[in-house]
Amino acid sequence: VYTYTNDMHPYSMSIPNRFEMEETPSGSGARYEDPETGFVINLFGYVNINDETAHEMFVDVDTSGKADLYTAEGDNWYVVSWCEDDTIIYEKTIVTDSTIATAHLEYSTANRDMGSKIIDTLLPTFQVD
């Protein structure tokens, strides 16, 4: 496991070594994929120019028509997870006064157990510095 740190928007997260990385052209994030399972982790961040709060962003999330919907909310973060066909999508967004950062994970329903393990292990390391 190593830690991805974004210098443009101060956030970081631990990533398994087997995941291959693609930096985004803008430098605001990175995309990682496990070549064996197709598990994808997209990390991206941007400046909180509108002084939004996590709660304001959470209530604006469009959850209509999403199957197996799961949501959670904390003081400065929220999670939305759902299924699209045979893909599970899990998004955690952290909001601070200066930065909004999102970890977007996608994995096959066939890899549900592995996905849950990765979420339980890695998402606690996702933070805005």
Question: Model segments located where?
Answer:
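Second-shell loop/turn segments in exported
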Residues: T3-T5, I41-N48, L105-D113
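Short secondary-structure junctions
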Residues: R18-P25, D60-E73, Q127-D129
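Signature of long, low-cysteine stretches enriched in small and polar/charged residues
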Residues: M57-M114
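Secretory pathway targeting signatures of secreted, lumenal, and periplasmic proteins
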Residues: D7-H55, C83-D86
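Surface-exposed amphipathic alpha-helical segments
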Residues: F19, I100-D129
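Short, hydrophobic/aromatic-rich segments at coil-to-beta transitions
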Residues: V1-T3, S26-G29, A72-S81
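Extracytoplasmic/secreted proteins, especially bacterial periplasmic and envelope-associated proteins
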Residues: S14, E56, K117-T121
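Intrinsically disordered, low-complexity Ser/Thr/Pro-rich tracts
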Residues: V1-T5, P124-Q127
